[in-house]
Amino acid sequence: MEDGATPPKPPAATLAADFRSLGAPERSPDLVDGIGGDLRLAFRAALRALRRARSYYVLDGFVTEHVDLARLESTCWKLVSLKEPDYARLQQMRRRRVACLDPLRDALQADAYRDLRATLGYEVAQVLAAIVEAKAERLRRYSGQALRERQQALEALKDRTCDVFDDFLKQCAGDARTQPGDTPRSAIERLAESDVEAYMNAQFVAARLRGKRFVAIPGDVRHAEDSLRRYKQCVADTAAAKKARNLPEDFFARELDLCEQMIHLLPTKIHHVRTTGGVLEDF
Protein backbone atom coordinates (compact mmCIF):
# COMPACT_ATOMS: atom_id res chain seq x y z
CA MET A 1 0.00 0.00 0.00
CA GLU A 2 1.34 3.46 -0.90
CA ASP A 3 2.05 5.95 1.88
CA GLY A 4 -0.99 8.09 2.60
CA ALA A 5 -3.38 5.75 0.78
CA THR A 6 -6.68 4.99 2.42
CA PRO A 7 -6.58 1.50 3.89
CA PRO A 8 -9.18 -0.90 2.50
CA LYS A 9 -12.31 -1.44 4.50
CA PRO A 10 -12.35 -4.64 6.52
CA PRO A 11 -14.47 -7.38 4.94
CA ALA A 12 -17.99 -7.83 6.17
CA ALA A 13 -18.47 -10.41 8.87
CA THR A 14 -18.21 -13.83 7.29
CA LEU A 15 -20.93 -16.39 7.46
CA ALA A 16 -18.58 -18.52 9.50
CA ALA A 17 -18.40 -15.76 12.07
CA ASP A 18 -22.19 -15.58 12.15
CA PHE A 19 -22.29 -19.30 12.82
CA ARG A 20 -19.71 -19.13 15.61
CA SER A 21 -21.58 -16.25 17.21
CA LEU A 22 -24.34 -18.63 18.26
CA GLY A 23 -22.05 -19.65 21.08
CA ALA A 24 -21.57 -15.99 22.09
CA PRO A 25 -24.80 -14.10 21.37
CA GLU A 26 -23.38 -10.74 22.36
CA ARG A 27 -21.28 -10.77 19.18
CA SER A 28 -24.29 -11.02 16.91
CA PRO A 29 -27.33 -9.27 18.40
CA ASP A 30 -29.28 -9.59 15.16
CA LEU A 31 -29.59 -13.30 15.85
CA VAL A 32 -30.94 -12.98 19.35
CA ASP A 33 -32.86 -9.69 19.60
CA GLY A 34 -36.48 -10.44 20.43
CA ILE A 35 -35.95 -14.13 21.08
CA GLY A 36 -36.05 -13.99 24.86
CA GLY A 37 -37.29 -17.30 26.19
CA ASP A 38 -39.08 -18.36 23.00
CA LEU A 39 -37.38 -21.60 21.97
CA ARG A 40 -39.15 -21.66 18.61
CA LEU A 41 -37.61 -18.30 17.67
CA ALA A 42 -34.21 -19.50 18.88
CA PHE A 43 -34.60 -22.63 16.75
CA ARG A 44 -35.44 -20.60 13.65
CA ALA A 45 -32.52 -18.24 14.25
CA ALA A 46 -30.17 -21.21 14.58
CA LEU A 47 -31.43 -22.72 11.32
CA ARG A 48 -30.97 -19.42 9.47
CA ALA A 49 -27.39 -19.11 10.69
CA LEU A 50 -26.60 -22.73 9.85
CA ARG A 51 -28.01 -22.47 6.35
CA ARG A 52 -26.07 -19.28 5.66
CA ALA A 53 -22.92 -20.99 6.84
CA ARG A 54 -23.62 -24.07 4.71
CA SER A 55 -24.04 -21.91 1.61
CA TYR A 56 -20.60 -20.44 2.34
CA TYR A 57 -18.86 -23.74 2.93
CA VAL A 58 -19.17 -25.22 -0.54
CA LEU A 59 -18.29 -28.89 -0.53
CA ASP A 60 -14.90 -28.66 -2.24
CA GLY A 61 -12.25 -27.69 0.27
CA PHE A 62 -14.54 -27.47 3.30
CA VAL A 63 -15.81 -31.04 3.59
CA THR A 64 -15.40 -31.43 7.35
CA GLU A 65 -17.02 -28.06 8.04
CA HIS A 66 -19.88 -28.92 5.70
CA VAL A 67 -20.49 -32.21 7.52
CA ASP A 68 -20.34 -30.51 10.93
CA LEU A 69 -22.89 -27.91 9.86
CA ALA A 70 -25.23 -30.51 8.39
CA ARG A 71 -25.10 -32.49 11.62
CA LEU A 72 -25.76 -29.36 13.66
CA GLU A 73 -28.83 -28.62 11.56
CA SER A 74 -29.98 -32.20 12.10
CA THR A 75 -29.44 -31.73 15.83
CA CYS A 76 -31.63 -28.62 15.77
CA TRP A 77 -34.47 -30.67 14.29
CA LYS A 78 -33.82 -33.49 16.74
CA LEU A 79 -34.01 -31.19 19.76
CA VAL A 80 -37.17 -29.43 18.61
CA SER A 81 -38.82 -32.82 17.93
CA LEU A 82 -38.20 -34.30 21.38
CA LYS A 83 -41.50 -33.08 22.82
CA GLU A 84 -43.49 -32.90 19.59
CA PRO A 85 -46.83 -34.68 20.25
CA ASP A 86 -48.19 -34.52 16.70
CA TYR A 87 -47.34 -37.61 14.62
CA ALA A 88 -47.31 -35.87 11.23
CA ARG A 89 -45.12 -33.01 12.45
CA LEU A 90 -42.73 -35.40 14.18
CA GLN A 91 -42.32 -37.50 11.04
CA GLN A 92 -41.78 -34.34 8.98
CA MET A 93 -39.02 -33.25 11.37
CA ARG A 94 -37.36 -36.63 10.98
CA ARG A 95 -37.57 -36.34 7.19
CA ARG A 96 -35.95 -32.90 7.44
CA ARG A 97 -33.03 -34.49 9.27
CA VAL A 98 -32.62 -37.08 6.53
CA ALA A 99 -32.88 -34.39 3.85
CA CYS A 100 -30.04 -32.34 5.30
CA LEU A 101 -27.71 -35.33 5.83
CA ASP A 102 -28.32 -37.97 3.15
CA PRO A 103 -27.45 -35.94 0.01
CA LEU A 104 -24.13 -35.04 1.62
CA ARG A 105 -23.51 -38.66 2.58
CA ASP A 106 -24.20 -39.71 -1.00
CA ALA A 107 -21.74 -37.10 -2.31
CA LEU A 108 -18.84 -38.35 -0.19
CA GLN A 109 -17.81 -41.30 -2.34
CA ALA A 110 -14.02 -40.89 -2.21
CA ASP A 111 -12.08 -43.34 -0.07
CA ALA A 112 -10.66 -40.48 1.97
CA TYR A 113 -14.14 -39.64 3.25
CA ARG A 114 -14.98 -43.07 4.69
CA ASP A 115 -15.14 -41.85 8.27
CA LEU A 116 -17.34 -38.86 7.39
CA ARG A 117 -19.63 -40.97 5.23
CA ALA A 118 -19.92 -43.49 8.07
CA THR A 119 -20.73 -40.75 10.58
CA LEU A 120 -23.50 -39.37 8.38
CA GLY A 121 -24.76 -42.83 7.47
CA TYR A 122 -25.21 -43.94 11.05
CA GLU A 123 -27.31 -40.90 11.90
CA VAL A 124 -29.39 -41.17 8.71
CA ALA A 125 -30.04 -44.87 9.31
CA GLN A 126 -31.13 -44.26 12.90
CA VAL A 127 -33.60 -41.58 11.83
CA LEU A 128 -34.97 -43.74 9.00
CA ALA A 129 -35.40 -46.63 11.44
CA ALA A 130 -37.44 -44.37 13.74
CA ILE A 131 -39.64 -43.37 10.78
CA VAL A 132 -40.18 -47.04 9.87
CA GLU A 133 -41.12 -48.00 13.44
CA ALA A 134 -43.58 -45.12 13.74
CA LYS A 135 -45.23 -45.94 10.41
CA ALA A 136 -45.43 -49.65 11.26
CA GLU A 137 -47.30 -48.91 14.49
CA ARG A 138 -50.04 -47.12 12.52
CA LEU A 139 -50.66 -49.79 9.87
CA ARG A 140 -53.55 -51.26 11.87
CA ARG A 141 -55.49 -48.05 11.21
CA TYR A 142 -55.87 -48.96 7.54
CA SER A 143 -57.45 -51.71 5.46
CA GLY A 144 -57.95 -52.68 1.85
CA GLN A 145 -56.11 -50.77 -0.86
CA ALA A 146 -54.97 -48.04 1.54
CA LEU A 147 -53.29 -50.69 3.71
CA ARG A 148 -51.62 -52.41 0.75
CA GLU A 149 -50.20 -49.13 -0.54
CA ARG A 150 -48.75 -48.28 2.86
CA GLN A 151 -47.31 -51.75 3.28
CA GLN A 152 -45.53 -51.53 -0.07
CA ALA A 153 -44.17 -48.07 0.72
CA LEU A 154 -43.02 -49.25 4.14
CA GLU A 155 -41.31 -52.31 2.67
CA ALA A 156 -39.33 -50.04 0.33
CA LEU A 157 -38.45 -47.67 3.17
CA LYS A 158 -37.33 -50.59 5.33
CA ASP A 159 -35.03 -51.83 2.55
CA ARG A 160 -33.60 -48.33 2.12
CA THR A 161 -32.93 -48.10 5.86
CA CYS A 162 -31.13 -51.45 5.89
CA ASP A 163 -29.06 -50.40 2.88
CA VAL A 164 -27.89 -47.28 4.75
CA PHE A 165 -27.00 -49.36 7.82
CA ASP A 166 -25.10 -51.78 5.56
CA ASP A 167 -23.21 -48.91 3.95
CA PHE A 168 -22.25 -47.66 7.41
CA LEU A 169 -20.92 -51.12 8.31
CA LYS A 170 -19.03 -51.25 5.02
CA GLN A 171 -17.40 -47.86 5.59
CA CYS A 172 -16.40 -48.85 9.13
CA ALA A 173 -14.89 -52.12 7.96
CA GLY A 174 -13.06 -50.38 5.12
CA ASP A 175 -11.72 -47.70 7.44
CA ALA A 176 -10.31 -50.47 9.63
CA ARG A 177 -8.79 -52.44 6.77
CA THR A 178 -5.68 -54.51 7.34
CA GLN A 179 -2.26 -53.04 6.60
CA PRO A 180 0.55 -55.11 4.98
CA GLY A 181 2.13 -57.35 7.58
CA ASP A 182 -0.79 -57.15 10.01
CA THR A 183 -2.10 -60.29 11.65
CA PRO A 184 -5.43 -61.17 10.00
CA ARG A 185 -8.28 -59.95 12.20
CA SER A 186 -12.00 -59.43 11.74
CA ALA A 187 -13.45 -55.96 11.13
CA ILE A 188 -14.81 -55.76 14.68
CA GLU A 189 -11.33 -56.46 16.09
CA ARG A 190 -9.73 -53.76 13.93
CA LEU A 191 -12.23 -51.04 14.78
CA ALA A 192 -11.37 -48.25 17.18
CA GLU A 193 -12.91 -48.96 20.58
CA SER A 194 -15.05 -45.82 20.31
CA ASP A 195 -16.68 -47.24 17.14
CA VAL A 196 -17.53 -50.69 18.46
CA GLU A 197 -20.87 -49.84 20.10
CA ALA A 198 -22.21 -48.02 17.03
CA TYR A 199 -21.04 -50.86 14.77
CA MET A 200 -22.77 -53.49 16.92
CA ASN A 201 -25.94 -51.44 17.26
CA ALA A 202 -26.12 -50.99 13.47
CA GLN A 203 -25.77 -54.75 12.98
CA PHE A 204 -28.49 -55.48 15.52
CA VAL A 205 -31.04 -52.96 14.22
CA ALA A 206 -30.43 -54.08 10.63
CA ALA A 207 -31.01 -57.71 11.70
CA ARG A 208 -34.34 -56.76 13.29
CA LEU A 209 -35.43 -54.69 10.29
CA ARG A 210 -34.54 -57.41 7.77
CA GLY A 211 -36.77 -59.75 9.74
CA LYS A 212 -39.80 -57.51 9.29
CA ARG A 213 -41.95 -58.22 6.25
CA PHE A 214 -44.68 -55.72 5.48
CA VAL A 215 -45.61 -57.34 2.15
CA ALA A 216 -46.13 -61.06 2.77
CA ILE A 217 -45.03 -63.53 0.06
CA PRO A 218 -46.07 -67.18 0.61
CA GLY A 219 -43.10 -69.52 0.91
CA ASP A 220 -40.55 -66.69 0.88
CA VAL A 221 -37.95 -67.04 3.65
CA ARG A 222 -35.13 -64.96 2.17
CA HIS A 223 -35.60 -62.06 4.57
CA ALA A 224 -35.74 -64.47 7.52
CA GLU A 225 -32.54 -66.21 6.43
CA ASP A 226 -30.79 -62.87 6.05
CA SER A 227 -32.01 -61.82 9.48
CA LEU A 228 -30.78 -65.09 11.01
CA ARG A 229 -27.36 -64.64 9.42
CA ARG A 230 -27.12 -61.14 10.87
CA TYR A 231 -28.13 -62.26 14.36
CA LYS A 232 -25.41 -64.92 14.26
CA GLN A 233 -22.89 -62.30 13.14
CA CYS A 234 -23.91 -60.08 16.07
CA VAL A 235 -23.20 -62.90 18.52
CA ALA A 236 -19.84 -63.70 16.92
CA ASP A 237 -18.77 -60.05 16.78
CA THR A 238 -19.80 -59.42 20.38
CA ALA A 239 -17.62 -62.32 21.52
CA ALA A 240 -14.71 -61.09 19.38
CA ALA A 241 -15.07 -57.53 20.67
CA LYS A 242 -15.07 -58.66 24.30
CA LYS A 243 -12.05 -60.87 23.72
CA ALA A 244 -10.04 -58.16 21.95
CA ARG A 245 -10.94 -55.30 24.29
CA ASN A 246 -11.48 -54.61 27.95
CA LEU A 247 -15.25 -54.30 27.61
CA PRO A 248 -17.62 -54.74 30.56
CA GLU A 249 -19.23 -58.15 30.94
CA ASP A 250 -22.70 -56.71 30.36
CA PHE A 251 -21.69 -55.00 27.08
CA PHE A 252 -24.51 -55.47 24.55
CA ALA A 253 -26.17 -57.90 26.99
CA ARG A 254 -29.82 -57.10 26.23
CA GLU A 255 -29.29 -57.16 22.47
CA LEU A 256 -27.21 -60.33 22.73
CA ASP A 257 -30.00 -62.07 24.62
CA LEU A 258 -32.50 -61.13 21.88
CA CYS A 259 -30.07 -62.34 19.19
CA GLU A 260 -29.77 -65.73 20.86
CA GLN A 261 -33.54 -66.02 21.19
CA MET A 262 -33.99 -65.33 17.47
CA ILE A 263 -31.20 -67.74 16.54
CA HIS A 264 -33.10 -70.43 18.45
CA LEU A 265 -36.54 -69.48 17.08
CA LEU A 266 -35.98 -68.64 13.41
CA PRO A 267 -34.80 -72.01 12.02
CA THR A 268 -38.07 -73.64 13.12
CA LYS A 269 -40.14 -70.87 11.53
CA ILE A 270 -38.11 -71.00 8.31
CA HIS A 271 -38.50 -74.79 8.06
CA HIS A 272 -42.26 -74.52 8.62
CA VAL A 273 -42.71 -71.96 5.83
CA ARG A 274 -40.55 -73.98 3.42
CA THR A 275 -42.52 -77.16 3.99
CA THR A 276 -46.00 -75.63 4.02
CA GLY A 277 -45.60 -72.74 1.58
CA GLY A 278 -47.18 -70.49 4.17
CA VAL A 279 -46.37 -66.94 5.19
CA LEU A 280 -43.73 -66.20 7.77
CA GLU A 281 -45.20 -64.02 10.47
CA ASP A 282 -43.45 -60.79 11.35
CA PHE A 283 -40.92 -61.20 14.14
PLM segments and residue spans:
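Helix-turn-helix repeat elements of alpha-solenoid scaffolds
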Residues: 37-52, 90-102, 155-180, 223-230
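Core solenoid repeat modules with strong leucine/isoleucine-rich periodicity
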Residues: 1-22, 51-57, 62-70, 113, ...
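Residues that mark the junctions of alpha-helical repeat units in TPR/alpha-solenoid scaffolds
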Residues: 46, 59, 64-73, 97, ...
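Short coil/turn linking the two alpha-helices of tandem helical-hairpin repeats
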Residues: 2, 79-88, 125, 130-140, ...
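Flexible helix-coil transition and linker loops at the boundaries of alpha-helical arrays
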Residues: 52-66, 103-117, 168-196, 241-244
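TPR repeat positional signature
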Residues: 49-50, 70, 77, 101, ...
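Intrinsically disordered terminal tails
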Residues: 183-186, 198-283
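Acidic, serine/threonine- and proline-enriched intrinsically disordered linkers and terminal tails
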Residues: 1-42, 134, 144-151, 171
